[in-house]
Amino acid sequence: MRIGILAIQGSVVEHEKMLKRLEVETVLVKKPEHLDIINGIILPGGESTTFFTLLENRLLFDVLREKLANGLPAMGTCAGLILLANRIENHPDQKTLKVLDITVSRNAYGRQRESFSTYIKIPILGEKEFECVFIRAPQIVEIGKNVKVHATFENKPIFVEEGNILGLTFHPELTDDLRIHEYFLKRCSE
């Protein structure tokens, strides 16, 4: 199995380290042709407006959207989630891939200095709580009828799934816990 990491900005190295610990081959996706040789893709955290600009400059936006619409599994964390979302509440004109039927609000959990981590029960990962690291995190404010919610914080979804797409408002790559990456790999092999 070969997993791509969208490598134009953000927490690329951290996701790569997690996948290496799981002994998975990684591809740093920087060009459209890289999308042809992977079994799934991670869209890391970073700055969402910059993401869109760089995706379009590298001619990745339309090709990535088509691959995702045709079933390529994806996991988006923080800004990666924003990129996948259908709608952005506080930036309605910002372009997105529109492959996950949710509405998000950018930076809903505050600025950098207000970042935090907390332990959350995520039933699909087992009994042990998962450390969720929120850094200028988006908030999912609305979900479509086919979106599964795997975890919530303060009654808001923080980990969702729709078809081949996983979306997280937090950063699992900033912990030592491999369970979310393992879950994503399982989804990629189905």
From Swiss-Prot:
One of its GO terms (molecular function) is glutaminase activity. The active site is at 78 (nucleophile), 171 (charge relay system), 173 (charge relay system). One of its GO terms (biological process) is pyridoxine metabolic process. InterPro entries: Class_I_gatase-like, PdxT/SNO, PdxT/SNO_CS. It catalyses: aldehydo-D-ribose 5-phosphate + D-glyceraldehyde 3-phosphate + L-glutamine = pyridoxal 5'-phosphate + L-glutamate + phosphate + 3 H2O + H(+); L-glutamine + H2O = L-glutamate + NH4(+). Its EC number is 4.3.3.6, 3.5.1.2. GO terms for cellular component: cytosol; glutaminase complex. SUPFAM superfamilies: Class I glutamine amidotransferase-like. Pfam families: SNO. L-glutamine binds at residues 46-48, 106, 135-136. Pathway: Cofactor biosynthesis; pyridoxal 5'-phosphate biosynthesis. Disulfide bonds: none annotated. Keywords: Glutamine amidotransferase, Hydrolase, Lyase, Pyridoxal phosphate. The keyword Lipoprotein does not apply. Belongs to the glutaminase PdxT/SNO family. In the presence of PdxS, forms a dodecamer of heterodimers. Only shows activity in the heterodimer. Catalyzes the hydrolysis of glutamine to glutamate and ammonia as part of the biosynthesis of pyridoxal 5'-phosphate. The resulting ammonia molecule is channeled to the active site of PdxS. This is Pyridoxal 5'-phosphate synthase subunit PdxT. It comes from Dictyoglomus turgidum (strain DSM 6724 / Z-1310). The lineage of its organism: Bacteria, Pseudomonadati, Dictyoglomota, Dictyoglomia, Dictyoglomales.
